[in-house]
Amino acid sequence: MGESSQAGVSTGGSGRLPSFQPYLGCESSDDDDWRMIGRPRNMRRSSVSLLEQQPKMTPRMRSVILCWLMEVCETYAIHRQTFYLAQDYFDRFLLLEKNLKLGAMQLIVLTCLLIASKMEETRPLKIRHLSYVANGIYLVEEFRDMELVILKALRWYIRPDTALTWLKSFLQVLTAEDNSDPMEQQFPKDIYIKITNLLDLCILDVNSLDTPYHGLAASVLCHFVDQELVQQITGVPKDLLQPCVDWMLPFMEALEEFGSEPQKHFPTIKKEDQHNIQTKLDYMTVLCLQSSTRCVSQKRCESARCGLVQTEDLCAWTRTHTSRIFLLMQ
């Protein structure tokens, strides 16, 4: 009698012990499937791919959905990184699933925020909070079912480096001082808010999907810091960075035309953490200003479409230089 039989565990005649991994409702629970958990799927991350996968969705619909999600985050004093995680989950889910119903988008994006809050917040959102902002049209079971659907689609890869992650890393390198604590933020909070407002606005545009997150973060910095210094810090060559910087210029001009707003105060949040809370400007109005101020020259029009050839070059460069980027940031 084999050792497994002596221990009272049947191998089912296959010579292998039974799996004690939880059943997630999948049709298959092969070892290959389990090995892929926590790893990102290979997919084309672009505006064209998303709109092909979701033909019923327009670029403006995506902007409205994410802008509304910012408002939800502000209502519950949710951190900006939590929003950016939710945005990443939402976009990846739309890229992976085909032809989703528009009526399900609110449930999907709220569930993405629910998952993100569990990853990032010390006090995660409750389903009842999300049900309230959705006017109670979704049951608790619907949120739980959707949570499982999204997690399975993403293969539980729910700790990606977001555009905000890259931005904060670059800022830390940029403002680092000798003998300073690397865990403390050294950059001025008011400048940080202006920088993140530009990133917020750009991420609402579906064309932001055509540029890697670190490229977006570096391009945002170029509008506040000398571009040569940004290139030195990020390691991204000018010929790959410049198209995204040009594409982003009308967003920066629109924000300047819109003007700044006083920093919002959240009574439940510590003073030193106030600037990390996701807030919402009237971004849809700013996007309209951005459209009206965008140059119509051929070069600007190509940048406005985030010329896929150029951004594909940036994506390819990223794949081969990822280790170099991290070395530069150390």
Across the structure, where does each feature detected by a protein language model lie?
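Acidic, serine/threonine-rich low-complexity regulatory regions at protein termini
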Residues: 1-110, 114-330
